[in-house]
């Protein structure tokens, strides 16, 4: 669904006299801060998440899954992130944190490092915990907070 159409639908349609947008809760409400925005991602694993929450991964550090990125590709991603002022680098916690943090630091972006699966970090025991970790991490980064 087009992000503009979705937002327009939520603003225009009402339930009990209030726009649906005012009634959003949970992850969809929290995700409003990053819906329609661009991020860089470490790996293509975020395709379904980015589609569901309408946040675009404009480029990937690891362009070919399972193959470490070349220094040249990393430089291309850094240049793109600087040019487009991409504010967030979204990555799983099993990738090289030093590389993730270096790219974020060199671009002025915030690294949001999260588990990919349940039990991938302390306190992430259920799918609901996992989704909350992802959504809250991105929302915090877009609000200027630490992740």
Map each language-model feature to its residues:
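Extracytoplasmic metal-acquisition and chelation regions
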Residues: 1-147
